[in-house]
Amino acid sequence: MDFEFAYSGEQEAFRQEVRAFLDQRVPPERHAPVDPESLDDDTFAYFREVHKEMGARGWLYPTYPKQYGGGGLTADHEMVIDEEMARRDIPRHFSNGLVLPSILVWGTEEQKKQFLVPLLTGQQTCYQTFSESSAGSDLAAIKSTAVRDGDDWVINGHKLFITGIREPDLMYGPFVTVPDGARHHNLGYFLIPYPSPGVTLERMTLLNGPGQLFIYFDNLRVRGANLLGGHDEGWQVAATTLEQEHGGRGAAFSPDADLHQLLAYIRETKRRGVPVGADPTVRLTA
């Protein structure tokens, strides 16, 4: 039974356009290491510029509306882009983009222009700040607070196991805004510019590398305009964020490049003078 997916002529023409851009913009010597945490500063800066150029074409987040910096394209176009970037070991994103639909759904027009456009065009990157010491799988158990002070909110608390390769331009996440409120109706969801006075990032020392962080908030003051949704709708906004991941959208990728790299590795890499692929144990378990 044949399960091969066939692209249309229009989609293949788009593939040629993407290939031409990537081949011209990213020569083989610029292909990135497999582990994003291995990117040096120069390589990271290089690919940030590539992302900005892709964002200008609407290719960084191709299925989002053009009016906010997306491409207005289809999921098939996005898969073509993903495949071609994966074949060249080009990092797809440096942001946690799960917040993007939340801004589309819950954001005001001003918030979409201020926060969504720079993220979709690659001008800015962002961190998701959800987990706390008391709230991992139970997000509703968070303790960090946001207290209203005039038109602003003052945030205190901490987050941990926050994924990030470099410093972001924006953070997002829920905080307790109604201390005596009912569960799931006591949170507000904030978009926090970085750097800001009162925010400290600290790398965690873990066996799997430095890609996780502590984030501390000490009397951080944010504008009321940075509240996404109502002051007690943070749980609902967070659910919109996480729905993308629950549906698989947070892990969309093209497996072909990984498979090709694996096949090349077992064919070309030798152990005791014999290709890895010829090892009986490898052949038995493949």
Summary of predicted features, one role per range:
Residues 58, 81-86, 175, 191-197, ...:
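Short Ser/Thr-interspersed hydrophobic loop/turn segments at strand-loop and sheet-helix junctions
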Residues 3-7, 199-286:
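Glycine-rich beta->alpha junctions and the first turn(s) of the following alpha-helix
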Residues 48-123, 164-170:
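Internal helix-loop-helix
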Residues 1-15:
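Intrinsic disorder at enzyme termini
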Residues 144-147:
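A structural signal for short hydrophobic beta-strand segments in well-ordered beta-sheet cores
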Residues 122-130, 173-174:
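A short, Trp-centered hydrophobic/proline-enriched beta-strand micro-motif
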Residues 151, 156-200:
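A short core secondary-structure module
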Residues 135-138, 153:
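Hydrophobic, small-residue-rich alpha-helical packing segments that form membrane-like cores
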